[in-house]
């Protein structure tokens, strides 16, 4: 009896380890999808950098770290990517978090509408590219049966009551987006490895 119990415990422990083990690079995602995602990350990064540079040049908001407390007061959320970190890289969780994060940034950028006339085209381009990226990920998740039964919903977005808050929010959102994209890029590159 004791031996059977030990065997059962060993088997269940092995099962739990297998379940928790992050997926390796041999994923079921097509290389064309992964390469397109990497291209989209670079495009969104370039758009985000352009927004940051324009906010810095036009409004002297060049250091997002100086605005962190204001970001907390405004309630600017950050998208989690724990399933995409190198310690816990999991394909399904990572794709879902990528999609949810892009969805969050779509909402944050919409909340920044009216930031300033000179920044509107840059903001619009960034929104379009994020939307395209989110759609691409969602379609792939549906194609391989990974899409959640219920798509993500938009949470409460910050309300910017002044032009300064909107511009400072833009600086923080662009900075947070860049950090999000760096993790996303590393995860996607990992999935492209044979």
Curated annotation (Swiss-Prot):
One of its GO terms (molecular function) is growth factor activity. The keyword Manganese does not apply. One of its GO terms (cellular component) is extracellular space. This is Granulocyte colony-stimulating factor. It holds the Pfam family GCSF. Coiled coil: none annotated. It comes from Felis catus (Cat). It comes from the Eukaryota. PROSITE patterns: INTERLEUKIN_6. O-glycosylated.
């Amino acid at each position: 009896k004791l031996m059977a119990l030990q065997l059962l415990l060993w088997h269940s422990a092995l099962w739990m380890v297998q379940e928790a083990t992050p997926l390796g690079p041999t994923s079921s995602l097509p290389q064309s999808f992964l390469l397109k995602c990497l291209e989209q990350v670079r495009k969104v990064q370039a758009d985000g950098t352009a927004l940051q540079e324009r906010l810095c040049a036009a409004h002297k908001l060049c250091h997002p770290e100086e605005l962190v407390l204001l970001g907390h007061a405004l309630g600017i959320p950050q998208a989690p990517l724990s399933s995409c970190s190198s310690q816990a890289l999991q394909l399904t969780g990572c794709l879902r978090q990528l999609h949810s994060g892009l969805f969050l940034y779509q909402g944050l950028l919409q909340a920044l509408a009216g930031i300033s006339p000179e920044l509107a085209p840059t903001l619009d381009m960034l929104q379009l590219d994020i939307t395209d990226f989110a759609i691409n990920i969602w379609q792939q998740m549906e194609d391989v049966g990974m899409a959640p039964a219920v798509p993500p919903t938009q949470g409460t977005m910050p309300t910017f009551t002044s032009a300064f808050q909107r511009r400072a929010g833009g600086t923080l959102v662009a900075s947070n987006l860049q950090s999000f994209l760096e993790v996303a890029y590393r995860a996607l590159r990992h999935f492209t490895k044979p």
